[in-house]
Curated annotation (Swiss-Prot):
CC cofactor note: May bind 1 zinc ion per subunit.
Protein transport keyword on record: yes
The protein's required cofactors: Zn(2+)
Protein name per the record: Protein translocase subunit SecA
Cellular location(s): Cell inner membrane; Cytoplasm
């Protein structure tokens, strides 16, 4: 039965259809200019950039020049890249320019679509940021698309981990900058910890196009980016606490997998109190006494490490380190660390070296970072399921771009088995069947553990002709994924295979050329070899198509429908045939957590025998409902995080704006003078209250305070004994003496040095107090939820108390700066203030725990070629992957010594 809404959509078209149609006149206009642009010489086409910039300077808007600018970018793309954007890609580009999200299916050329609005918006000269999910994609896309922008007279920069501040500053100064979301966020935080405006690297937030926008703005949104510094080493305590956990039984604790929480029962608490008392770690009688808060925290982390975190699913142990696995992508995140002691608890569990804990120095969520941009847009293949969130939080519409060719992929109903064993048996049988008919197969798993289990089961069946792609072997990721479309190929992959690299039927020409011809110099011989490879790929493609195209088999449903859709979307690109199917069991995490007991009983009543599956659209709908529940819960979490983070964000903006003003100021005399005046006001009000009798004045307290804050020994006792003296008189005398002392110091130092000293002291003091403030807000937030039991709104309570804490911060700043400036003396060479040792982190999106990564301010130095010893790699410094290897082999670094970086022997 067709719904009324369905009838209306057929008659009038959906809102999405109407929005797409609204761009059609511009498409027609761009196409009308095609012949004219094609007739231009390379020089004349490139000169259009200067012409457009002049038009903008004369008062035209970007919208006014959209049609000719898109026509120029399209023609330049055809000449430089050999790719001409289709009409639907022009529409995608216009969607991005209009501050919206373009939902485009896999293989529809999102990277090429981005070049059109990037070129148009870069003409304004304010910079455009193209945001990717990893360094590999940032480098790949900037290198490829940089040729196009360079042809049109624009500079392209790329920000990746390991660049110096000078390199970052230069990259941000380019017309177009490619970077990962993490690098952008960390650079923003680090910039706001600098002590000189000239040291800052970013130049503003004009326009950002976020690739894989759902991954960055949704999956990562509930977890802040954090810059932190090391605390004292407490590794012995972690090891001692860890030893208690194996002595507990199941009755001693409760695990909630839905909420990812672990708590001790009453019996468990008593048992732990006995253990801690014997170890001399318990203070007082009860574990939950105030003085035992830190111990409770350690014990909870140890319990989570053993009962919630699974090795080879949540993390792996590699090179004697605990390395986090991203649950959304399956990728390893080397250097990232959980915060709050959780990573140390895992290190104690795995008996590897325990690294020191960290203290938060600065933090921001991606939600608040990306909302700073004047214009924001995004691209992805899967955004419609989160359209409400994009609209509510970022003000972004999601517009589905039609595919250039109809999708031919067949999405089959799920098959549900009772146990893992039955499910994997069915999957292997299906893989072998597809392999017999030469059909390429991509098998998606949710964890490393599952991918390796499936691989082992296949080996036991005697089948070894497959590739395994998971976080253990991520170095080979791009090539394995690129070749997954070859006839008969079987690729077992975690979620990481879902993004970044296209699976092309028959294989990927670019990857084949790089692998097979990297030692062949450019020339006729190389050109002929490329032509041979291209011909071979075409033959293989036809074989893959004849076998039914790429067959995506999923071994489990993810809690997010988007991740499932991404996996499905690997098949059926650009009108190719394809097929997808999910194999599930009642023991899968999603089924088990969301009420599979009922379903198991029902299947038994239906008489389902071992090895048999149930296939029914009702199952798909039930699973979709479960996934929607999880997505709704996660959306609520993200909305809640944002409400609280907005409080911190407002305060962060004030502090960061103040820092910039302080760095820009040429004279801080008035600023520190106001602080000094406020301190005097506070001291007099506190020790000589208004309308109090002279006998009630606290002369001793005032004298001590003046000595502490102004380094002055004043006859305050004599002043208060004078006949008829009032608090205003004392205030005036204090002000006069303090101003005179400050003026004498300023004259002694000289204006230039005095301003430098004032700026250094104010900035360093502000930074130290801001760090303490972040910790205080974290503590406040961790307990504010209990106010709900008293029928008070925790958010409103948090806002009120956060404001009081902020007022206290400003008051402490005035006092600390005044006291330090009163005592500061001139030394021969004033030391440049140095930022603290820093680490970066981004909390894992699925567990709500931090992931800490050491991010040095400057990680590696660049060494000039003449200072490199070919025999000693330690003298080489940082080397670009495409540079010649310093060893003298003649090969590119990535194909010589660079090939050994980060690899492990498997």
């Amino acid at each position: 039965m067709v719904s009324l809404g369905g009838i209306a959509r057929k008659l009038f078209g959906s809102s999405n259809d109407r929005r797409v149609k609204s761009y059609q006149p511009n498409v027609v206009a761009i196409n009308a200019l095609e012949e004219q642009m094609r007739a231009l010489s390379d020089e004349a086409l490139a000169a259009k950039t200067v012409e457009f910039r002049q038009q903008l300077a004369d008062g035209k808007t970007l919208d006014d020049i959209l049609v000719p600018a898109f026509a120029v970018a399209r023609e330049a793309s055809r000449r430089v890249l050999g790719m001409r954007p289709f009409d639907v890609q022009l529409i995608g580009g216009m969607i991005l320019h209009s501050n919206a999200i373009a939902e485009m299916k896999t293989g529809e050329g999102k990277t090429l679509v981005g070049t059109l609005p990037v070129y148009l918006n870069a003409l304004a000269g304010k910079g455009v940021h193209v945001v990717t999910v990893n360094d590999y994609l940032a480098q790949r896309d900037s290198a490829t698309m940089g040729r196009l922008y360079g042809f049109l007279g624009m500079r392209t920069g790329v920000i990746v981990h390991g660049l110096s501040d000078d390199e970052r500053r230069d990259a941000y100064a380019c017309d177009i900058t490619y970077a990962t979301n993490n690098e952008l966020g960390f650079d923003y935080l680090r910039d706001n910890m600098k002590y000189d405006r000239g040291q800052m690297v970013q130049r503003g937030h004009n326009f950002a196009i976020v690739d894989e926008v759902d991954s960055i703005l949704v999956d990562e949104a509930r977890t802040p980016l954090i810059i932190s510094g090391p605390l004292d080493d407490r590794s012995d305590l972690y090891i001692t606490i860890d030893a208690f956990i194996p002595g507990l039984t199941k009755d001693d604790y409760e695990i909630d997998e839905k909420q990812r929480s672990a708590n001790f029962s009453e019996d468990g608490t008593e048992k732990l109190e006995t253990m801690l008392r014997e170890a001399g770690l318990l203070k007082g009688e009860s574990l939950y006494d105030v003085e035992n808060v830190a111990i409770v925290h350690h014990i909870n982390n140890a319990l989570k490490a053993h009962k919630l975190f699974q090795r080879d699913k949540d993390y792996i142990v590699r090179n004697d380190e605990v390395v986090i696995i991203d649950e959304f992508t399956g990728r390893m995140m080397p250097g990232r660390r959980y915060s709050d002691g959780q990573h140390q608890a895992l290190e104690a569990k795995e008996r590897v070296q325990i690294q020191p804990e960290n203290q938060t120095l600065a933090q921001i969520t991606f939600q608040n970072y990306f909302r700073m941009y004047d214009k924001l847009a995004g691209m992805t293949g899967t955004a419609s399921t989160e359209a409400e969130e994009f609209g509510n939080i970022y003000g972004l519409d999601v517009i589905e771009v039609p595919t250039n060719l109809p999708i031919q992929r067949i999405d089959e109903d799920d098959e549900v088995y009772r146990t893992h064993e039955e499910k994997f048996k069915a999957i292997i049988a299906e893989i072998l069947e597809a392999h017999k008919r030469d059909q390429p197969v991509l098998v998606g798993t949710t964890s490393i553990e599952k991918s390796e289990l499936l691989a082992e089961l296949m080996r036991k069946q005697g089948f070894t002709n497959f590739q395994v792609l998971n976080a253990r072997y991520h170095e080979q990721e791009a090539y394995i994924v690129a070749q997954a479309g070859v006839p008969g190929a079987v690729t077992i992959a975690t979620n990481m295979a879902g993004r970044g690299t296209d699976i092309q039927l028959g294989g990927n020409l670019e990857m084949r050329v790089e692998r097979d011809l990297h030692e062949v110099e450019p020339g006729p011989e190389r050109d002929a070899a490329i032509a041979r490879i291209a011909e071979e790929i075409q033959v293989l493609k036809q074989r893959s198509i004849a076998a039914g195209g790429l067959y995506v088999i999923a071994s489990e449903r993810h809690e997010s429908r988007r991740i499932d859709n991404q996996l499905r979307g690997r098949s059926g690109r650009q009108g190719d045939p394809g097929r997808s199917k999910f194999y599930l069991s009642l023991q899968d995490d999603l089924m088990r957590i969301f009420g599979s007991d009922r379903m198991d009983g029902m299947l038994q009543k239906l008489g389902l025998k071992e090895g048999e599956a149930i296939v029914h659209p009702w199952i798909n709908k039930a699973l979709e409902r479960a996934q929607k529940k999880v997505e709704a819960r996660n959306f609520d979490i993200r909305k809640n995080v944002l409400k609280y983070d907005d409080v911190l964000n407002d305060q962060r903006k004030v502090i960061f704006e103040q820092r910039v003003e302080l760095m820009d100021a040429t004279d801080l005399t008035e600023t520190v003078g106001d602080m000094r005046h406020d301190v005097i006001e506070d001291l007099v009000s506190k020790h000589i209250p208004e309308r109090a009798y002279a006998e009630q004045w606290d002369a001793d307290g005032l004298k001590t305070a003046v000595a502490n804050f102004f380094d002055l020994d004043l006859p305050i006792h004599d002043w208060v004994k004078e006949e008829g003296i009032a608090e205003d008189d004392i205030r005036a005398r204090l002000t006069e003496v303090a101003e005179k002392a400050a003026a004498e110091k300023a004259e002694r130092f000289g204006p230039e040095i005095m301003t430098y000293v004032e700026r250094s002291i104010v900035l360093q003091t502000l930074d130290n107090l801001w760090r303490e403030h972040i910790v205080n807000l974290d503590h406040l937030r961790s307990v504010i939820g209990f106010r709900g039991y008293a029928q008070r709104d925790p958010l409103q309570e948090y806002k009120a108390e956060a404001f009081e804490l902020f007022q206290a911060l400003l008051n402490n700043l005035r006092q600390a700066v005044t006291a330090q400036l009163s005592r500061v003396e001139l030394v021969q060479q004033p030391a440049e203030p140095q930022p603290p040792a820093m680490h970066g982190s981004h909390i894992d999106a699925t567990t709500g725990q931090d992931e800490f990564a050491p991010l040095a301010m400057i990680n590696e130095t660049v060494v000039s070629p003449e200072n490199r010893d070919p025999q000693n790699p330690t003298t080489w410094g940082r080397i670009g992957r495409n540079e010649a290897c310093p060893c003298g082999s003649g090969k590119k670094y990535k194909h010589c010594h660079g090939a050994f970086e980060n690899n492990e022997v498997v």
